[in-house]
Each structure stands twice: as C-alpha cells, then as structure tokens.
Amino acid sequence: DRQLYFNEQSITTQKYVIPFIEKHKPITADSHILEIGCGEGGNIKPFLDLGCKVTGIDINGGQIAIAKEIYSVHPNNRNLTLICEDIYKVTELHNKFDIIIIRDVIEHIPNQELFLPFIKRFLSPHGVIFVAFPPWQNPFGGHQQICNNKLLSHLPWFHLLPRPAYK
C-alpha cells in the first residue's frame, strides 16, 4: 500500500528525523533541504509543511511523477523542486543546502566510497547530512515489503535465506 508507506515515512520524519536534526541544526522556513532518493516524497512532506525550500531527487521517473502529483495540491508546493536524475550526473542543483537527507537510500547508491565526498559539494558551509539505513539484520531489511507477492512481502527475514533458496 503506497499511501501507507508514504504516511509512515512522513510520520517518522516528523516525529524522529526532524527532532534529531534540530539537535544539530535549526530548521526554519529559510532552510534549504535536499533529499537524495526521495521516491514519492514521504520524507519531504514534514519539511514542506514547515515552509522549507525542498529539493527532492530520484533516479526513478515513475516515483518522481507520483510525487509531483501528490504535491500539486500542497499549499507550499512553490517551495518544492523535484528532479529525476542520477545524483552523480545531476546538472540542476545550483543551490547549497543546509540539510541533506539520505534515508533508506544509501544501500542503493553505487560507488558508496565516493558518495559522501561527492555530495559535500551540495552542502552549505554549516550544513548537515542526515544518513539512515535499514539494518540488514532486521526482519524487513531486504525491503521485501515492496514485493508484489503478498506472501513474500510479509515474510520476515526472507532476505537472509541462502542464495540457492531464491531459485
């Protein structure tokens, strides 16, 4: 259920991510936020609700299209820019950002050893980067909840089975 997932992301960001970031960096309507791997934009909503200037980037055009549809009616949508592009190839990011969000995405980014040094170019001098990832050893660490198969999507620990079990 995509709406349920969107809401979970939004609520988690509002209740946990923003308070965590605010211990290190105040968030105001003047804050410029970049989310890398924004998907349909669940993590973006709480920042947009606060009036922040938000940019979301994702390589998946379908998810960006859904995010554009979702946010077309948001009262602060003039503060939102959504970009479909590979972060390593993006040419549209000209601003420096106060906060960069990388939530449950870094495990999908190629060349991870180059990634954090690369994205520093988008960070303002006193900006912060928030990185969170699903622990592989948790029941749904393999993202099986997004499987189309109803049984497999609810099967915890499925991703830890030996490779031959997938054939």
Task: Put a short name on every predicted segment.
Residues 102-105:
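A short beta-strand submotif of the Rossmann-like class I SAM-dependent methyltransferase core
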Residues 110-118, 128-167:
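S-adenosyl-L-methionine-dependent methyltransferase catalytic module, highlighting the catalytic core
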Residues 59-62, 80-81, 107-108, 126, ...:
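Glycine-rich loops and low-complexity Gly/Arg-rich segments
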Residues 89, 107, 138:
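Active-site micro-motifs of SAM-dependent methyltransferase domains
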Residues 1-95, 99, 116:
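Conserved N-terminal segment of class I S-adenosyl-L-methionine
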